[in-house]
């Protein structure tokens, strides 16, 4: 995993969406709980957002579903946005100091009223995907 290529995927999604990073109120991290991957992803997210955006990983609930994880996490991210409640990363008690300066959602869920969210998936072999979703109105 490379922070540079992850950051590029995030930047492309933001640019394609036509919104700014300040409009995105939550990021669903790929977050596989691997040292190299999580550090790279958090650093890439910090680099692009330039602020401590709220972030958590849904894999802590169901593990890594391989090819299905992107679909599952995108759907769950949209559902959380609709409900204005975002799940924490389970069992995340200590943030590695090498991770990016982000607003890690831990302990309990959080109410966030946001019109835009991002879902990231950074897969084997450098297949990187970032999607921005807008609340349906």
What are these regions (language model features)?
Residues 1-137:
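Conserved "HGTGT" condensation-loop signature of ketosynthase/thiolase-family condensing enzymes
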